[in-house]
Amino acid sequence: MTTPASPKGSLLSGVVAAVDPGRSKCGLVLADCTRGEILTAHVVAAEQTLMQLEAWQQQTPLQALVMGDGTSSRQWMRQLQHLAPVQLVNEAGTTLRARDRYWQIWPARGWRRLLPQGLRVPPCELDAIAALVLLEDHLGRPLHWSTPPPSGPGLKTVPAP
């Protein structure tokens, strides 16, 4: 079952997964929309996406899947719609906004804070942060990410509580 994206102020509640779909890798975020916080997040190879979402579904029933409408989203919808209702969100510009959102969550420290934000490069892949941006766009409000920033080049997993 597929439904269009909700207007700002969506009343989604409970546990929701967000997916920034891609051909080779996907950003995934699991959030408790009732509490307004991120539970966990990962960047996984595309072929591991369904397995990760099914594992989350077994732990806590998903109320919805929020997914970007770009790269191969129609293909992903067919694979994921059995887990929960899929709600598409316009993903235009989310990669650039994910970079800004990264620095909002984890402000630069030391000499890096002297660099203009546009010149700062986050120390991890941003696919999970892009999934966060998609979910926040859909909800019309920011979510709280209470864990330390991801670190290290080539990082595949974004830590969460």
PLM feature segments, named:
Residues 1-161:
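Phosphate- and other anionic-substrate recognition elements at nucleic-acid/protein interfaces
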